[in-house]
């Protein structure tokens, strides 16, 4: 199990407190158990029966409050953990601008701010969630963060980036799995969606896709990775190569990372009240580097270091 370093954990805690306060303001004086009950209902709709997936649940104040008080911080930390892993491998490009697709109230963009991001375009179909994202970003600036956000309300299936726009990072956290979920051609349609937004990613920029670790979200993500092989992308993580996914070859086993995590007290309390296990972070994710310089960055570190040593000899 991997760990998150202390400095990053401290800043994640600052963002958590900001989002937590926004969630409390959204819902008035509801008792903790009432919020836990809302969380349990939301969790069942997203990861159990999945009846809430691809619906307008974030336009319901109660559901959005439960999300802000629980899932927001989890998405924040999962995205940050993946970015930290890429940084440790020396595969994280300079990040100043972010396109956050299916952003919800912005946890992924806030995570990117801890790795240099200064401005972000958030795209989501929920006006209420985008409003919460702007509120959180504004409070973040008052707390010393420097993230500027703009928003576009749009169904992702109809979204195309602004003409001429270029971003250092395109991130989709827990959103791609909701696209065309009942379509037999969902992998191809998700691939085509990624292709449609790639012109907005600069050469050398990072595409990061993060999903829950469950089998029904991990396997489709791995299948999407396979469908993107041979595009103008090179895989930077978790596997730093473009060979066929070894986990899919093992009868479709899920692939996910797990990080040690000491949940904030409010998260732990809600998890206990809702009957959820939250002793670590788990997420499936894939990261790609775009462009001609991507090939060198995407080679395994040992291979790159070996080549550098030979050149110095």
Residue ranges and their predicted role:
Residues 188-204:
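A short glycine-rich, Lys/Arg-flanked "PGG" loop and its adjoining helix->strand segment in the class I
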Residues 168-187:
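A short SAM/SAH-binding and catalytic strip from SAM-dependent methyltransferases
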Residues 55-82:
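Class I SAM-dependent methyltransferase Rossmann-like catalytic core
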């Amino acid at each position: 199990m991997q760990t998150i370093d202390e400095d990053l954990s401290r800043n994640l805690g600052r963002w958590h407190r900001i989002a937590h306060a926004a969630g409390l303001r959204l819902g008035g004086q509801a008792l903790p158990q009432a919020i836990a009950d809302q969380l349990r209902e939301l969790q069942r709709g997203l990861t159990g029966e999945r009846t809430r997936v691809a619906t307008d649940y974030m336009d319901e104040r109660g559901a959005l409050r439960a999300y802000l008080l629980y899932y927001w911080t989890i998405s924040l930390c999962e995205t940050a953990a993946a970015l930290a892993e890429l940084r440790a491998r020396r595969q994280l490009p300079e990040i100043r601008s972010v396109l956050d697709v299916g952003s919800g109230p912005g946890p992924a963009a806030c995570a990117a701010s801890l790795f240099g991001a200064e401005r972000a375009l958030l795209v989501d179909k929920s006006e209420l969630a985008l409003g919460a994202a702007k509120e959180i970003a504004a409070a973040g600036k008052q707390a010393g963060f420097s993230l500027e956000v703009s928003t576009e309300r749009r169904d992702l299936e109809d979204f195309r980036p602004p003409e001429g726009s270029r971003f250092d990072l395109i991130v989709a956290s827990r959103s791609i799995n909701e696209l065309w979920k009942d379509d037999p051609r969902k992998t191809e349609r998700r691939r085509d969606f990624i292709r449609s937004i790639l012109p907005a990613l600069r050469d050398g920029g990072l595409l990061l896709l993060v999903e829950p670790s469950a089998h029904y979200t991990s396997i489709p993500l791995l299948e999407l990775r396979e469908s993107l092989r041979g595009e103008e992308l090179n895989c930077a993580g978790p596997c730093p190569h473009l060979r066929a996914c070894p986990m899919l070859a093992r009868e479709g086993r899920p692939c996910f990372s797990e990080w040690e995590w000491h949940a904030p007290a409010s998260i732990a309390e809600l998890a206990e009240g809702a009957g959820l296990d939250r002793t670590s972070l788990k997420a499936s994710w894939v990261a790609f580097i775009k462009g001609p310089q991507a090939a060198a960055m995407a080679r395994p570190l040992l291979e790159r270091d070996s080549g550098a040593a030979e050149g110095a000899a």
